[in-house]
Design a protein with these regions (language model features):
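Structural signal for interior beta-strand "rungs" in well-ordered beta-sheet cores
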Residues: 153-273
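Terminal amphipathic alpha-helical/low-complexity segments used for targeting or macromolecular assembly
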Residues: 1-147, 277-300
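Core catalytic architecture of nucleotide-activated donor-dependent transferases building glycoconjugates
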Residues: 146, 150-154
Length: 300
């Protein structure tokens, strides 16, 4: 059901490319209106299910023990009111997606057209799912939101938590293996490549050793940052504006604006120390052998 809803919403957002193949200009308004009506009605039924599930869960818990993130997800709005509020956000979603697609087209020399980016790129598919899911997440529907992003995860290999905050003009190139955690914050005009992880380094626990929910534990990536393939960035650290993070870098500390971080830089100090220690050990061993050969005759 959710897959059909997402397909309907995407078709309504981009009727000329994701709508009917024989759609005429004079029929666009009707198509968009009808498609939205069907998708939103089906979404109402899904919202009812989540709210029912939430109510059942709440009845089993002491409300005073809910943490801030759980409490924020409890809503008193009716399903129709929530979906109506969601629908009001769709024009904004379309505008954001336009910037994402434009960024991909301008940032990838292999892209022949914006249409190719829209219909072919897995990163675009994942971002469409994320943009829709994020609105639902903000409206207090974390289950539906997570299910939507997991549909994209299954289809593209790109795992974006709907709670992440991502600015305009976001481009994921290739995409397979990308992971963006729940509390990650990504600025404008950010480009990331395949197998990048924006994850948590550690998280606080309660007195029973259970992880606390909702704590900020993922990176903040400022505007105009590029993160190349295989980079792993962990913890609540900040990647300064205009920085470039090289391939396969393991990063657990903040870097200032304009930084250019490479794997060689990250490994330079440990490698130099290790090399020095190895050379020293080899030299000492050789000297010891020479000294020993002078002091003790070698048996033949």
């Amino acid at each position: 059901m959710l897959q059909e809803i997402i397909e309907g919403l995407a078709a309504a957002l981009f009727p000329n490319r994701l709508g009917l193949p024989d759609l005429k200009e004079e029929g666009i308004d009707y198509f968009v209106g009808h498609t939205l009506d069907v998708a939103l009605r089906e979404l109402v039924s899904q919202v009812k299910l989540e709210l029912s599930f939430t109510a059942d869960t709440q009845s089993q818990l002491d409300a005073s023990k809910l943490d801030a993130s759980q409490a924020a997800n409890l809503t008193t709005q009716s399903p129709i009111e929530i979906v109506r509020e969601f629908a009001k956000n769709l024009p904004k979603v379309r505008l954001l997606l336009d910037t994402d697609i434009k960024s991909a087209y301008e940032g990838d020399p292999a892209a022949r057209s914006v249409d190719e980016v829209l219909v072919c790129y897995p990163g675009t598919q994942a971002i469409i799912h994320y943009r829709i899911a994020h609105v639902l997440h903000e409206l207090g529907l974390p289950l539906i939101a997570r299910m939507i992003t997991e549909l994209a995860h299954s289809a593209t290999g790109i795992d974006i938590h709907p709670g992440a905050v991502i600015g305009e003009s976001f481009f994921i190139d290739h995409g397979t293996g990308v992971v963006i955690g729940e509390t990650a914050i990504i600025g404008k005009h950010v480009r990331i490549y395949q197998a990048v992880t924006l994850g948590a380094k550690r998280f606080p626990t309660d007195e029973h050793g259970n992880p606390l929910k909702g704590n900020a534990r993922h990176p903040i990536v400022e505007d105009d940052v590029v993160i190349y393939a295989g980079a792993t960035i962990l913890g609540r650290i900040t990647i300064g504006r205009g920085s470039a993070i090289g391939g396969n870098v393991w990063l657990t500390r903040s870097v200032p604006a304009g930084s250019n971080i490479t794997q060689a830089q990250m490994l330079a100090t440990p490698l130099d120390v290790s090399a020095h220690q190895a050379n020293s050990s080899h030299t000492n061993s050789a000297n010891s052998t020479k000294q020993l050969s002078k002091e003790v005759p070698i048996a033949h």
